């Protein structure tokens, strides 16, 4: 018995029309009422890919910064509360998160950082979350992630996104407000909530309270560790006695061990550490239980489903109420498509157009036969038309081959862009032709410790495969010659001193963000 396969039309579009984003930007008078943003209006406008006037964006960001600046470096929050992990510019999934977790008007929220970069709707996430903070300053809380800084937002996508959608002034305002974000939260006097993890320089909660957070995070030290550190890959079954080892995946900070966490929890009378920072296939992970309490010593929560549109992971939020902890998972939502690195469709289509135009020119020049090109003039001298036309054909033919390479490699270029942290191709790749592109692709795959059997042309089908290819993006990017300055003019060193407690180790950490 034959199985009938569904028939698809080859002459009609599956989706016949796409709504055009609103062209008019919302004004200050429209967005604000009694000094607070109108959340329903803003949400509906942003979901349609609408934008606001620059003065509206600046007011939301600066008003949010004023509230965040008044909060302590380690805030104290009470249950019931919903704890959320990385968002990474996935605005349409953030809307799904609030559907799953509950309306912010009657639900308490704690976000653990990484609101921007990698996704293409980061500024929408900032504007919406900061508007919620203005409306609910005592029930919605925001912590800093490792991506809320100048160094990473310049290296990845957020700075470019701000320039394209708004201006560099909006980006600078975001950097100022990121400097105001708290670094940790003490939940119900039971849980320490941070973005990354622990630090050998932090042995008690008071060490966190004393930290100066109002600056660009340095490349090392306790602030860096709170934002960047990870649990060991073999957390809970370590083969080393070291509490902290150098984080070879990040290129900065540390891996921390199960004994280090248990010791910290015991010394500070805590149940567990709740953190984000690493993608999880199920959206969360409960680590080995603390033998003294029977409760998981460490919990990772991740709230960006189908991360980068290739991970195929679920997202999750953690709801804590009446001493009961529940995990709610959710899948990704449809979202508008952006070409990599915010490329416009004209730039993307140039190789295709160029190939066809050069083909047409070659065909026009080839109309002349050999006999026509050998015609002599009245004085009997052979014209130079034959050589001139042949030279033109050769030149245009060479150009045609370049466009053909570009056209054939368009999809591969997209793939290579996705595997490079800056979203740009290595210098000289295109001028070297197809073979150079193939070589660059293979080098990219090797550099990222791609899993065995992976080829660039084939589609990424699993969480582990995506994580292996994206490993290079887990590292702290190389720093520029100039150090970053914060508002008071202090400078931070861009070198990383040797870790006194770091042993030589090649553990590979999990996917991180």
Swiss-Prot record:
Pfam families: Metallophos. Its cofactor is Fe(3+); Zn(2+). Expressed in osteoblasts and bone marrow (at protein level). Expressed in the testis. Expressed in the sperm midpiece in a SPATA33-dependent manner (at protein level). A motif (SAPNY motif) lies at residues 303-307. Residues 400-407 are annotated as: Autoinhibitory segment. The gene is Ppp3cc. It catalyses: O-phospho-L-seryl-[protein] + H2O = L-seryl-[protein] + phosphate; O-phospho-L-threonyl-[protein] + H2O = L-threonyl-[protein] + phosphate. This is Serine/threonine-protein phosphatase 2B catalytic subunit gamma isoform. Calcium-dependent, calmodulin-stimulated protein phosphatase which plays an essential role in the transduction of intracellular Ca(2+)-mediated signals. Dephosphorylates and activates transcription factor NFATC1. Dephosphorylates and inactivates transcription factor ELK1. Dephosphorylates DARPP32. Residues 344-366 are annotated as: Calcineurin B binding. Residues 385-399 are annotated as: Calmodulin-binding. InterPro entries: Calcineurin-like_PHP_ApaH, Metallo-depent_PP-like, MPP_PP2B, PP2B, Ser/Thr-sp_prot-phosphatase. It comes from the Eukaryota. Forms a complex composed of a calmodulin-dependent catalytic subunit (also known as calcineurin A) and a regulatory Ca(2+)-binding subunit (also known as calcineurin B). There are three catalytic subunits, each encoded by a separate gene (PPP3CA, PPP3CB, and PPP3CC) and two regulatory subunits which are also encoded by separate genes (PPP3R1 and PPP3R2). In response to an increase in Ca(2+) intracellular levels, forms a complex composed of PPP3CC/calcineurin A, calcineurin B and calmodulin. It comes from Mus musculus (Mouse). Fe cation binds at residues 86, 88, 114.
């Amino acid at each position: 018995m034959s199985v009938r396969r569904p028939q698809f039309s080859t002459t009609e579009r599956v989706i016949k029309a796409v709504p055009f984003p609103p062209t008019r930007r919302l004004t200050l008078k429209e967005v604000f009422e009694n000094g607070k943003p109108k959340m329903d209006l803003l949400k509906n406008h942003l979901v349609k890919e609408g934008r606001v006037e620059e003065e509206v964006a600046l007011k939301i960001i600066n008003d949010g910064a004023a509230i965040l600046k008044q909060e302590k470096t380690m805030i104290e929050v009470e249950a019931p509360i919903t704890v959320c992990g990385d968002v990474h510019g996935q605005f349409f999934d953030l809307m799904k998160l609030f559907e799953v977790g509950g309306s912010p008007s009657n639900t308490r929220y704690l976000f653990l950082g990484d609101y921007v970069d990698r996704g293409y709707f980061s500024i929408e996430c900032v504007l919406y979350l900061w508007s919620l903070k203005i409306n609910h300053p005592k029930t919605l809380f925001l912590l800093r992630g490792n991506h809320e800084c100048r160094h990473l937002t310049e290296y990845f996508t957020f700075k470019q996104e701000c320039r394209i959608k708004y201006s560099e002034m909006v980006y600078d305002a975001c950097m100022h407000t990121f400097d105001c974000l708290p670094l940790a939260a003490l939940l119900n006097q039971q849980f320490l909530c941070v973005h990354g993890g622990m630090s050998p320089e932090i042995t008690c909660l008071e060490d966190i309270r004393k930290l100066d957070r109002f600056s660009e995070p340095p490349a090392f030290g306790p602030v860096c560790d709170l934002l960047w550190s990870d649990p060991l890959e073999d957390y809970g079954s370590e083969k080393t006695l070291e509490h902290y080892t150098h984080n070879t995946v990040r290129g900065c900070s540390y891996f921390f061990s199960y004994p280090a966490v248990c010791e910290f929890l015991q010394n500070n009378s805590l149940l567990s550490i709740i953190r984000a920072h690493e993608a999880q296939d199920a959206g969360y992970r409960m680590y080995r239980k603390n033998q003294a309490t029977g409760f998981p010593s460490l919990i990772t929560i991740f709230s960006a489903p189908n991360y980068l549109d290739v991970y195929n992971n679920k997202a999750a939020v953690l709801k804590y109420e009446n001493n009961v902890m529940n995990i709610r998972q959710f899948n990704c939502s449809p979202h508008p498509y952006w070409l990599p690195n915010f490329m416009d469709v004209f730039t993307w289509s140039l190789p295709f157009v160029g190939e066809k135009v050069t083909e047409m020119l070659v065909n026009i020049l080839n109309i002349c036969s050999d006999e026509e090109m050998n015609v002599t003039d009245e004085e009997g001298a052979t014209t130079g038309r034959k050589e001139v036309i042949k030279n033109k054909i050769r030149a245009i033919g060479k150009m045609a081959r370049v466009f053909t390479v570009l056209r054939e490699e368009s999809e591969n270029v997209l793939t290579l862009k996705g595997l490079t942290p800056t979203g740009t191709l290595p210098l000289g790749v295109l001028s070297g032709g197809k073979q150079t592109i193939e070589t660059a692709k293979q080098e990219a795959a090797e550099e990222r410790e791609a899993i065995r059997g992976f080829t660039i042309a084939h589609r990424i089908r699993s969480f582990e495969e995506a994580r292996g290819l994206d490993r290079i993006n887990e590292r702290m990017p190389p720093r520029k010659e100039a150090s970053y300055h914060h508002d008071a003019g202090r400078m931070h060193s861009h070198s990383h001193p040797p870790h006194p407690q770091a042993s030589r180790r090649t553990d590979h950490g999990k996917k991180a963000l």
